[in-house]
Amino acid sequence: MEKLTDLNYTLSVITLMNSTLHTILEDPGMAYFPYIASVLIVLFTLHKASIPTMKIALKTSKCSYKVVKYCIVTIFNTLLKLAGYKEQITTKDEIEKQMDRVVKEMRRQLEMIDKLTTREIEQVELLKRIYDRLMARSTDGIDMTKEINQKNVRTLEEWESGKNPYEPKEVTAAM
């Protein structure tokens, strides 16, 4: 544990890596050297950061399997992001959460469809009742006297004097 947190040890490992890389890749025209060095530095940093973190987490956590799984998934997701991939590794818990969310949304939509279907059925039944009432009445013998308020209208023969009192009369006015 002392070596993991010792700064001199860390610096000596970085120096050793740099010298090893320089001896392996002596060609000055090597175009991929900065990329290889970056990947190795990231891997070394992940190594130095993850081991002490996992040791502490395993000692303090009640469920060590979940901690290890989460650390490994996080490390792989970081490496995938560095490599330029947009996909990520998901754990079973995350998949179950997403599935629960999808199932919940599907249930909500099914309830809405059920409500809409019920309303549509009620509207169709109402339209059918209206149609049945319209078709049940016959249009031949409808008494329109009630509709136009002409129930007490008399014909010319029914007037007492035989003349219509509402007809205009000739009136002469003095000038």
Swiss-Prot record:
GO terms for molecular function: channel activity; metal ion binding; toxin activity. It is a single-pass type III membrane protein. Homotetramer. Interacts with the immature particle in the viroplasm. Interacts with host CAV1, early and late in infection. Interacts with host integrin ITGA1/ITGB1 heterodimer. Interacts with host integrin ITGA2/ITGB1 heterodimer. Interaction with microtubules blocks trafficking to the Golgi apparatus. Residues 52-175 are cytoplasmic. The keyword Cytoplasm does not apply. GO terms for biological process: monoatomic ion transmembrane transport; symbiont-mediated activation of host autophagy; viral process. It is found in: Host rough endoplasmic reticulum membrane; Host membrane, Host caveola; Secreted. Pfam families: Rota_NSP4 (PF01452). It comes from the Viruses. The N-glycosyl content is primarily Man(9)GlcNAc, with a small amount of Man(8)GlcNAc. Glycans are attached at residues 8, 18. GO terms for cellular component: extracellular region; host caveola; host cell rough endoplasmic reticulum membrane; membrane. This is Non-structural glycoprotein 4. Binds 1 calcium ion per tetramer.
